[in-house]
Amino acid sequence: MMANWAEARPLLILIVLLGQFVSIKAQEEDEDEGYGEEIACTQNGQMYLNRDIWKPAPCQICVCDNGAILCDKIECQDVLDCADPVTPPGECCPVCSQTPGGGNTNFGRGRKGQKGEPGLVPVVTGIRGRPGPAGPPGSQGPRGERGPKGRPGPRGPQGIDGEPGVPGQPGAPGPPGHPSHPGPDGLSRPFSAQMAGLDEKSGLGSQVGLMPGSVGPVGPRGPQGLQGQQGGAGPTGPPGEPGDPGPMGPIGSRGPEGPPGKPGEDGEPGRNGNPGEVGFAGSPGARGFPGAPGLPGLKGHRGHKGLEGPKGEVGAPGSKGEAGPTGPMGAMGPLGPRGMPGERGRLGPQGAPGQRGAHGMPGKPGPMGPLGIPGSSGFPGNPGMKGEAGPTGARGPEGPQGQRGETGPPGPVGSPGLPGAIGTDGTPGAKGPTGSPGTSGPPGSAGPPGSPGPQGSTGPQGIRGQPGDPGVPGFKGEAGPKGEPGPHGIQGPIGPPGEEGKRGPRGDPGTVGPPGPVGERGAPGNRGFPGSDGLPGPKGAQGERGPVGSSGPKGSQGDPGRPGEPGLPGARGLTGNPGVQGPEGKLGPLGAPGEDGRPGPPGSIGIRGQPGSMGLPGPKGSSGDPGKPGEAGNAGVPGQRGAPGKDGEVGPSGPVGPPGLAGERGEQGPPGPTGFQGLPGPPGPPGEGGKPGDQGVPGDPGAVGPLGPRGERGNPGERGEPGITGLPGEKGMAGGHGPDGPKGSPGPSGTPGDTGPPGLQGMPGERGIAGTPGPKGDRGGIGEKGAEGTAGNDGARGLPGPLGPPGPAGPTGEKGEPGPRGLVGPPGSRGNPGSRGENGPTGAVGFAGPQGPDGQPGVKGEPGEPGQKGDAGSPGPQGLAGSPGPHGPNGVPGLKGGRGTQGPPGATGFPGSAGRVGPPGPAGAPGPAGPLGEPGKEGPPGLRGDPGSHGRVGDRGPAGPPGGPGDKGDPGEDGQPGPDGPPGPAGTTGQRGIVGMPGQRGERGMPGLPGPAGTPGKVGPTGATGDKGPPGPVGPPGSNGPVGEPGPEGPAGNDGTPGRDGAVGERGDRGDPGPAGLPGSQGAPGTPGPVGAPGDAGQRGDPGSRGPIGPPGRAGKRGLPGPQGPRGDKGDHGDRGDRGQKGHRGFTGLQGLPGPPGPNGEQGSAGIPGPFGPRGPPGPVGPSGKEGNPGPLGPIGPPGVRGSVGEAGPEGPPGEPGPPGPPGPPGHLTAALGDIMGHYDESMPDPLPEFTEDQAAPDDKNKTDPGVHATLKSLSSQIETMRSPDGSKKHPARTCDDLKLCHSAKQSGEYWIDPNQGSVEDAIKVYCNMETGETCISANPSSVPRKTWWASKSPDNKPVWYGLDMNRGSQFAYGDHQSPNTAITQMTFLRLLSKEASQNITYICKNSVGYMDDQAKNLKKAVVLKGANDLDIKAEGNIRFRYIVLQDTCSKRNGNVGKTVFEYRTQNVARLPIIDLAPVDVGGTDQEFGVEIGPVCFV
């Protein structure tokens, strides 16, 4: 029992934490949604919940079944064996009155009441209950021979109740109870009140460690659960103390007539007889009320997968279809007055699924996961493009001395040729012929798991499996990972028009210019004010039939239907989200090899992985390429005198000889690190079909599915023929309940038994659970392929996918047909007068507009001098709009206007189609090496240490006698590298190891000392000395050619004298090339500068005269790459050289940079979503411009930027079980598994035969693994941190109040909180006031500098909003500026958890009134604040929307700097934080103000 609790505790805590969020959501949604699918019943004005049972009359019993009332009549027992039966009040059936002295005394005990309704059982296993009452009396046994009449003996002791039987299988879960009204606020938080009920009985509260709140009112009764399966009979217990006399049992059925006995004589009264054996079980009584759900049974064996169920009957007609196409938009109505802001709307219904979003940018690399089990080897990939040559590696250890080669034929010494001009890059040579395939090597170590192949076609229908036992209801699982973005939904209708924007300040009237020509059509302006609703349009045409509606309420259990036709295979579904990593399955049989997939695109280079496990030795590789020339070694000590060679000059290097024979197999080398995953190879031929696999291990039992619809009632079966009567056998042990036999002939009257009270008539029982699985049937033949199934219902709308990278520009499309004319936009406000254009041709005369109002007749004056500009007059009444005249010809385009302020967001446009995939971006710079992981288990021998300093070559010692082979010792720690010994004799060539990963680039070593002279070669004939050619002029430097493959090893050159180090000079202008100087030593590497813009190509310099060839300088250290230089002019073509010998095969290069994008191919199918890119830092918020005049209504814009990911939707219904997956690759026990499971010992005995494969073998060694204890201890610590988080970034609290309750000793300061729970990645840093429990979030930025923000020639004493109206002003933001949306989301949850909010705002002023106007003695010029719900908070008016002032030194305009401190405190937490501020007394050039935004605090 305690073990169960310990296992359940972590899950239980997760359930409790989930419950907090669910309860909050439920409180929001219950008020709106009512009671979901459950339908109550009403009878005689009384309302009953679904599944309620009641008795409207004594002899009638009813049940509410989803709105339908089912009643049944109670039938009474025909005969009561008593003198005067009595019918109790309110009951239907009479019972025997229990009189004293009748042997049935009840000792004052009252009648047994009706069975109460089951309460709500929490998902907590309680302690084991007491034994149940004794079963019903058995039926009467066969009549025995008549015995002598005995005296009645005293009542024997009653036996102790037997132990309870095996718990029955759990019933299907009942439907949810009707939601209760929310209880009053508890002392703690809403979740505490919910947990208080659990705390009273189960003790759960004390385990979880929550502070209980006050108990809410009891909710209405939940529905009745289904009856659990009857448990088996327990063993008979030892006799108990005498119990109270039981009620009289029912009369047993009459036994068969026995043979007549001989009449015996009356005997002496006998001794008390022993208690008789328990009689056979009586016939089953009327069905009782369904019992409370039983305890979860033991986990059964995994059942076989069942066949696909029969096709259901045709569903009810679907709900109303989708709306027809949107009708034409009505004419724009007149502009309505602006309405007050409405309260926040309720949560709308889930929208239709959007279209699949474009792929998002790749995400940040996640933290390195644990080392996975090595997967099976992937198929070899296509060879990658040749990469750039890697940096020169560190010098390797000195190799063994090779065998002496044969002397080559002497060649003639050629004369040195003239240096040729630098040739242009040659074209790449043709691809060489494919080599013959090598012999098959031993199997490699398992590679990483391959990407999942395409879904195979549906296989033939399998044999119907035996039904599995119903599984135990599991605890609620953790929330699954966020699913992949769903496809784009269909285009939604045009959204409602937004609210009317704020009216801008009145502009000065301009001088009336002459009418300009009609300009070209302007760019679309900002969205205008919305018009009032138009008249309702005509009724649309009948829409198409809508999709199938959501499933209706669950019907009552029907009779089993007849099996339907096999369904057609459904359409292929979308790829599901990757599931949670399941437990490692048993090793399945090897499947047939699948067809090779198409080669995928080359992936981006991943971060360097951990070294793989030691692989098996690979096949012998081909001969390696010759290495680069080694640096000269130290001069060796003279060796022993060699045999005299023939003197001769050194001949030229002979051609490379053919590869030698394979040497003997060398010792196994240390394993190289795992190479990069190769690309998938070309598709191989399809393999032959594999043999059918063995029957798989039965899968885990699936979750209990929803009850199916009620089937049609089956026909009654035929009656079987009666069997032959058998001979009476010996009396056996009491059996279980047998089925009722055929009615026997009436026997003689038995002795009347004690009459028991009749039980209540039970309700018709629900369908019983599935029977135990029958024996395994023979394997059936493969069924024929079923007909195609009907398409499934549309899936629920997926989450919107992440925003994909912009695609490449597509080819210019053909010009489309002219679209329908857009809606007439509302009239824009008057723009500034443009500069006078040239007079255009006169347009056609428009229709005359209606006559305007008569003006006042003015007195004609003499034309005076132009006066100064007057103040703006009030606008005259607007005349009625005339009908639009015909379009005039296009005029000259006007000057470009200034940038307008950002308009209000436009209405949501139709989602555009997904853009094409953009060209691949340039390869990113290789990232820095990741941090070192924790030390692993004992690994293979470490990497070779850095080579030590060269030792001198020791004298050659005499060869010692060979020693005997010693035992192999454990690998010791790496010693310091010793001095290099003399070269040993050449060993046999080892097999080529696996290509290692590229090592980190080492610094270039210092040049070595000259090596020892080689043995003199045979003398070749002296060649003729050629004439020395004249030195050619130095050609201009050509552009860098491609990196060539390594050439054959050249002879070592003589050491040159090192040049002196030159001083690092400043970079001068580029001069003409001078004569070639002596090479200087390598300068110190400079820090890499930024890549400059490519310069213009320089003019070709004059060639300098050739300088003498200097001795080669010492190789300097390799510098860091400099900036890209300008591209030089192309050199002249050199003479074509002789064709060289074929070079050695080069190393496989690294992957090259991606080539330029090719022409656009045909539209491919949607690819696999790429990884998310790292999120770029958001740019700084720019200042808002002045509010522009609203322009005409623009065309429908492109789809908007994808919104942030919404909150997780409600959990959908469980999907149907998928087909069984293919068998996984054989796994390897990794070190981590070895730690926990213990090391498998091959000498362990096999499992005993009496244990089946899925049971644990007995552990005779009884090992205890310390790794398990450490894991449990770590898990316990993590759970403790989950229960009481400490406010760190890794373990954020939910609110500061929670933190205060869990850690009352903590001081006030900054802590991390995560109000929406879930991932800790979106936790925010806040200030916690530990004295009050307040959670305070700071503004960002927290102040506005004091200056003149608003200048107006005619201040009109109206509030001017800093964020909306003023240039460079913006509304106040809160939280981290790098992720402002996170703070907004968290504040939404924080408001749900808080009952009060407060905030202070400080207005810093100079010559500007903040609150009280000292001159006018009123509050007309007080600052106005705007809350988060767009509510204006003022100095006067309704007290709920009024702030208080803590300090005010801004009442006088005396040139001093003052400040006014406002405070607003409210229990409507949606009004805070303050997001904008509007001073009234601003506009003058000497008026300045600034703002300090205090943190908003919730408690």
Curated annotation (Swiss-Prot):
SUPFAM superfamilies linked to this entry:
FnI-like domain
Q: What does this protein do?
A: Type V collagen is a member of group I collagen (fibrillar forming collagen). It is a minor connective tissue component of nearly ubiquitous distribution. Type V collagen binds to DNA, heparan sulfate, thrombospondin, heparin, and insulin. Type V collagen is a key determinant in the assembly of tissue-specific matrices.
InterPro entries reported in the protein's UniProt record = Collagen, Collagen_superfamily, Fib_collagen_C, VWF_dom
For bias type Basic and acidic residues, the affected ranges are: 710-721, 776-787, 1063-1072, 1127-1141
Concerning its family, UniProt says: Belongs to the fibrillar collagen family.
Q: Which medical condition is this protein associated with? A: Ehlers-Danlos syndrome, classic type, 2: A form of Ehlers-Danlos syndrome, a group of connective tissue disorders characterized by skin hyperextensibility, articular hypermobility, and tissue fragility. The main features of classic Ehlers-Danlos syndrome are joint hypermobility and dislocation, and fragile, bruisable skin. EDSCL2 inheritance is autosomal dominant.
Residues recorded as bearing 3-hydroxyproline in the entry: 919, 1156
Q: Which PANTHER family match?
A: COLLAGEN ALPHA, COLLAGEN TRIPLE HELIX REPEAT
What span is annotated as the signal peptide, if there is one? 1-26
Question: Where does the UniProt annotation locate this protein?
Answer: Secreted, Extracellular space, Extracellular matrix
Q: List the disulfide bonds.
A: 1296-1328, 1336-1497, 1405-1450
Query: Where do the annotations place Ca(2+) binding?
Result: 1314, 1316-1317, 1322
An example of a Gene Ontology BP annotation on this entry? skin development
How does the record comment on the protein's domains?
The C-terminal propeptide, also known as COLFI domain, have crucial roles in tissue growth and repair by controlling both the intracellular assembly of procollagen molecules and the extracellular assembly of collagen fibrils. It binds a calcium ion which is essential for its function.
Q: What is its main location?
A: secreted
Q: Which gene encodes it?
A: COL5A2
Composition-biased stretches (Pro residues): 170-182, 236-248, 919-929, 1171-1181, 1211-1226
Q: Check the record and name the Pfam families matching this protein.
A: COLFI, Collagen, VWC
Q: Which UniProt keywords apply?
A: Calcium, Collagen, Disease variant, Disulfide bond, Ehlers-Danlos syndrome, Extracellular matrix, Glycoprotein, Hydroxylation, Metal-binding, Repeat, Secreted, Signal
- Here the segments flagged for biased composition (Gly residues) are 732-741, 894-903
Q: How is the subunit organization of this protein annotated in UniProt?
A: Trimers of two alpha 1(V) and one alpha 2(V) chains in most tissues and trimers of one alpha 1(V), one alpha 2(V), and one alpha 3(V) chains in placenta.
Q: Where is the composition biased (Low complexity)?
A: 212-227, 322-340, 427-443, 604-626, 694-709, 742-758, 826-841, 1093-1114
**GO molecular function annotations of the record:** extracellular matrix structural constituent conferring tensile strength; metal ion binding; SMAD binding
Q: In terms of domain of life, where is this protein from?
A: Eukaryota
Hydroxyproline sites (modified residues): 290, 293, 296, 611, 617
What's the protein here called? Collagen alpha-2(V) chain
